Amino acid sequence: MAFILRRRFLRRFLPRHASPLPPATENHIFPWSFFRAGPAIWRQSRPVAVRDSAQMQTFGALLQMSTRAEQFAGLSVAMVTPFRDGAIDTRRFHEQIDFQAKAGVTCICPVGTTGESPTLTHDEHERVIAESIQAAAGRMLVMPGTGSNSTAEAIRLTKFAAKAGANAALVVGPYYNRPTQQGLYEHFKAIAESVDIPICVYNIPARTGRNIEPETIIRLASLPRIAMLKEATGSIDQASQVLAATDLTVLSGDDSMTLPLLAIGGRGVISVVGNLVPADMKALIQAFEKGDLAKARMLHGKLFTLCRDLLGLASNPIPIKAAMAMIGRDTGDVRLPLVSLEAPLADKLRQVLADYGLPVAKA
């Protein structure tokens, strides 16, 4: 019943905008003007404005009706993989997980884009999954990346994660080989039917070269193990279509899109900036959930420049690793073919961190 009410609400107010929203940039940075007088989608779609806290709380409650994997709502952090002398630095990795546990995050997501999974060997990938589960020790959920452009390989990694004790698996769309929508459906279906843990479909067409269309995601939602969507297309329209038709737990895959996505029924974020300031991103989500839109807007504005430069100065995870080193939490260099941040960009990032109020070591 809750899902039916939520779907009716979203269908009434979200899909029929008067005009298209501004397109996202390559790095999916959503314009701050979206929030100047309340989310544009509210202004275009609602017959009356939300004017008081009671109305806001009612509005928030409608958007937050139970979704399929509600235990993953909130802040998840896309973990970096620390290296030392070219090898995985297990000690520093455990330290980063302890840092997130103390911050009270909902979930950690190792071996994804931020964790440099494309440059890990198969053995290293499995080792990071196992170390994550061991270090988390039940203090937070663990959702490792297990995707591949080979369905058989994705199934193997997902089965390993499930056997190791992962709470869910984050499965990126197949990259490089550009399957059809039917191929994408069959890929995720095969993975979902191979394990008994929830699957989060990760849609990031800027990296994979193929968008998983809303119609395909809606088809996938009919499968019991498909429970979540990591939404990194930059399209509010696409997210709205999925939210209106399914009870999937939708998580933002772009830090700067967290508040816009929450505003249409998203339930949280898988965050890169959470490696630096998990408390602020967690506070943004909690403020929205409590109906304190003014505080949520303030935190969005505070985080915006930091989020923009972590995703815009160079390919992720180059800037986040540089930033962590600058504030005294060094996780080593990135692996080739990625290279360290160039000096002028490093100087800019150092200034961004200092302006944010983070303790930056001198160059």
Model-derived segments and spans:
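Catalytic alpha/beta core domains of metabolic enzymes, predominantly
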Residues: 193-194, 205-304, 309-312
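Intrinsic-disorder-associated, low-complexity terminal segments enriched in Asp/Asn/His/Tyr and depleted
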Residues: 27-28, 52
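Active-site beta->alpha loop and helix N-cap motifs at the rims of alpha/beta catalytic domains
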Residues: 67-77, 81-209, 217-219
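C-terminal alpha-helical cap/extension of soluble enzyme domains
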Residues: 74-82, 103-105, 114, 263-266, ...
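N-terminal export leaders
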Residues: 9-10, 34-35, 53
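Extreme N-terminal basic, low-complexity initiation segments
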Residues: 1-13, 17
